[in-house]
Amino acid sequence: MLYKIGQIIRENNNYIKNVGIIIENPILVNEYTVNENLSYLKKMSKNSNDINLDEWYKFFGIEEYKNTLFSKLSLGTKQKVGLIQAFMHKPHNLILDEPFNALDKGTVEKVQKYLLEEKEKGTLIVFITHINDSILNYCDEVIEIENGKIIKINKK
């Protein structure tokens, strides 16, 4: 359930549609192709007419996989599809759980550049990672948690 200042907002579709989420191992429908999965999600977006999936496939270099079943993809390609799913509707808020998991160096650099551009536009980015170096350029604040407790807060 989603809360904002003690208020349940789960029913507020406008707020929910403004959040892009990627989890460590993206989960989509295994029996659907990449294009079927993302086209379905695209239809649910308020700005679906502005989403060009072919541009995202090109950005991530996965044009050749768009008609491949999600279950047949490598972990790195699944991660790219998960990132498209999180980014394609240009959300105001991003929650990224280990977004660079299984990605090659070139893709990591492209995603880092994209995230810096989105941050400059005012996108709120919440990073969940074990690799501190991968987030330092994006963060105004880093909160380190160990065993469920905050152990350190670093602010720029």
Which residues does each predicted region cover?
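Helix N-cap at the start of a conserved alpha-helix in ABC-type nucleotide-binding domains
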Residues: 105-106
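H-loop/switch region of ABC-family ATPase nucleotide-binding domains
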Residues: 129-130
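Hydrophobic anchor residue at the start of the ABC signature
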Residues: 83
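Q-loop/switch helix immediately C-terminal to the Walker
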Residues: 25, 31-44
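Conserved ABC ATPase signature
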Residues: 69-75
